[in-house]
């Protein structure tokens, strides 16, 4: 198995994101939805990590000395802010163009992130483990979700955390995330998502717990079109995030 291929990699999905790689940091471009979503993701990860590890989220570097890996990091729009919070961040992406964009932006910004054109399978096989493992907006793009989650969870150190964000497989998510976002509003390039690959909270929880972790939180995320902002919610019918922990022993 090469470092950029594996059972989790859908080459069509990789090619689709490579075609728009140059736009990762364009807040008005194809990734604008993720840019708007980013503050919610960062807050959720920071606050959950701080509660778990007994940190103060108000500190300038609340994630200092914690190792974190961002699977499917794309151009680094999540990796960089988490590195700015003090985490030692590794960003993985199987698309070489994405990695080049991420590396160039991090170098220009002066933010230390270890970007690699690797799969999580290669990292786990090499024996690397992390305090925090992220699979944000990734599980709906892989070939075999349970196998991918099992491998991603294997990268979590004892006492560490796993996070995932994805889309629920409901008629509402089809109407909003595909018909609305891709075809009516044009927020995302057409073909970005395949509704049949969306994952229900029960399916994701089952995969995570089969990998030996315990889900400690499930939170919905909703979009307010009037304010143009995303916010956490009890509503998991479309977008949601989970956090899970690996027992210390």
Swiss-Prot record:
Keyword Calcium: no
Catalytic class of the enzyme: transferase
Keywords from the named record: Methyltransferase, S-adenosyl-L-methionine, Transferase, Ubiquinone biosynthesis
Residues given in the record as S-adenosyl-L-methionine binding sites: 41, 72, 93, 136
Catalytic activity entry: a 3-demethylubiquinol + S-adenosyl-L-methionine = a ubiquinol + S-adenosyl-L-homocysteine + H(+); a 3-(all-trans-polyprenyl)benzene-1,2-diol + S-adenosyl-L-methionine = a 2-methoxy-6-(all-trans-polyprenyl)phenol + S-adenosyl-L-homocysteine + H(+)
GO MF: 2-polyprenyl-6-hydroxyphenol methylase activity; 3-demethylubiquinol 3-O-methyltransferase activity; polyprenyldihydroxybenzoate methyltransferase activity
Cross-referenced Gene3D superfamilies: Vaccinia Virus protein VP39
EC numbers on record: 2.1.1.222, 2.1.1.64
Pathway(s) annotated for this protein in UniProt: Cofactor biosynthesis; ubiquinone biosynthesis
GO biological process: methylation
Record-stated family: Belongs to the methyltransferase superfamily. UbiG/COQ3 family.
Function (record text): O-methyltransferase that catalyzes the 2 O-methylation steps in the ubiquinone biosynthetic pathway.
PANTHER family assigned: METHYLTRANSFERASE, UBIQUINONE BIOSYNTHESIS O-METHYLTRANSFERASE, MITOCHONDRIAL
Alphabetical list of HAMAP family matching this protein: UbiG
Protein's recorded name: Ubiquinone biosynthesis O-methyltransferase
Organism for this UniProt entry: Methylobacterium nodulans (strain LMG 21967 / CNCM I-2342 / ORS 2060)
Organism lineage string: Bacteria, Pseudomonadati, Pseudomonadota, Alphaproteobacteria, Hyphomicrobiales
Gene that encodes the chain: ubiG
């Amino acid at each position: 198995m090469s470092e950029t291929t594996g059972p989790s990699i859908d080459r069509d999905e990789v090619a689709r994101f490579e075609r728009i790689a140059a736009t990762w940091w364009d807040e008005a471009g194809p990734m604008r939805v993720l840019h708007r979503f980013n503050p919610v993701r960062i807050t959720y990860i920071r606050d959950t990590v701080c509660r778990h590890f007994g940190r103060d989220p108000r500190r300038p570097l609340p994630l200092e000395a914690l190792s974190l890996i961002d699977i499917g990091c794309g151009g680094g729009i999540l990796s960089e802010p988490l590195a700015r919070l003090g985490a030692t961040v590794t960003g993985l992406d199987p698309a070489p163009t994405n990695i080049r964009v991420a590396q160039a932006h991090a170098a220009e910004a002066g933010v230390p992130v270890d970007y690699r054109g690797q799969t999580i399978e290669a990292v786990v096989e090499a024996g690397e483990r992390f305090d925090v493992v992220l699979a944000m907006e990734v599980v709906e793009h892989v070939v075999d979700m349970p196998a991918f989650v099992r491998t991603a969870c294997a990268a979590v150190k004892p006492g560490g955390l796993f996070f995932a964000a994805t889309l629920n497989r409901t008629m509402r998510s089809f109407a909003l995330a595909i018909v609305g976002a891709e075809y009516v509003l044009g927020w995302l390039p057409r073909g970005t998502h395949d509704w049949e690959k969306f994952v229900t909270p029960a399916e994701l929880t089952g995969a995570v717990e089969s990998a030996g972790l315990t889900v400690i939180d499930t939170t919905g995320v909703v979009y307010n079109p009037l304010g143009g902002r995303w916010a956490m919610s009890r509503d998991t019918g479309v977008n949601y995030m989970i956090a899970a922990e690996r027992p210390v022993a």
